[in-house]
Every structure is written in structure tokens, then in C-alpha cells.
């Protein structure tokens, strides 16, 4: 994202995702007639109403939360939202809010068991995404 939308791309070697031409699925105002047939579409986007700064994450491969297995967990630095995105063959199946925390999510990590963690920029604390008791 740059000004209005954040996006998630499924990377292909040599792929053109439209940087400096479009944001998400939308042509930039300075290039309103952008040619889209040679660009690779994102699998998901969200507007500034949902968040303002995407923080890339990991595909969940842990055992603690079975319903998240295979989901791409990512967050938003400004809102503290963490979502689970499911895709099949490069197309979004679902995108669900997992949790909203009162932190600035600056990075994600994954341990050897596939459990996912995130870091709060303000405190530097590390948190594990876990099932609610």
C-alpha cells in the first residue's frame, strides 16, 4: 500500500504487481488508465478504514489452533488487528479478524512448531498467538 489501500500479494518470480501504477486493485490517481492485463492482482486488499500499515506475517502451521492451520496471519501496525487469510490457487477464500490488540504490530515470527508470534513496537515485547481459554 501507499496512500489508500494495503495489499497482500502471492509472489511469483519476476512478477509485476503494479508498484507505482496501482494500489491493490485500483489505478493510482496519477495513472488513471493503467493497463492491468500484464499486472498480477493481489489476493487481498484493505482500505484505510480497516487499517493503515500492513505488517506481513506467516502461514500458521502450529497445532494449538487447528482452525488457523494453513491461514496466512498478518496484522496492521496502526490498528493492532491480526487477520487470518485463507487462499486456494492464489484466490482468497476468506479473511477473518483473529484478534485486535492494543499494540503496534511491527513484526511476526514463527517457532519450530509452527506457532506464530508478534512484537509490539512500543515495548519490544513478544506475544504468542494462542487459543483463548
Predicted feature residues:
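Conserved blade-ending motifs and adjacent loop-strand segments that build the rim/top face
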Residues: 54, 91-112
Amino acid at each position: 500500500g501507499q496512500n489508500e489501500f494495503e495489499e497482500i500479494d502471492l509472489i511469483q518470480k519476476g512478477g509485476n504487481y503494479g508498484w507505482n501504477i496501482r494500489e491493490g486493485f485500483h489505478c493510482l490517481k496519477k495513472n488513471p488508465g493503467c493497463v492491468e492485463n500484464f499486472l498480477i492482482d493481489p489476493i487481498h486488499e484493505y482500505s484505510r478504514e480497516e487499517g493503515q500499515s500492513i505488517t506481513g506475517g506467516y502461514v500458521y502451521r502450529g497445532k494449538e489452533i487447528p482452525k488457523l492451520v494453513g491461514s496466512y496471519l498478518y496484522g496492521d501496525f496502526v490498528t493492532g488487528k491480526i487477520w487470518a487469510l485463507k487462499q486456494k490457487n492464489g484466490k482468497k477464500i476468506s479473511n477473518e479478524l483473529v484478534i485486535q490488540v492494543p499494540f503496534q504490530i511491527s513484526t511476526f515470527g514463527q517457532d519450530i512448531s509452527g506457532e506464530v508470534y508478534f512484537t509490539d513496537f512500543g515495548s519490544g515485547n513478544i506475544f504468542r498467538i494462542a487459543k483463548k481459554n
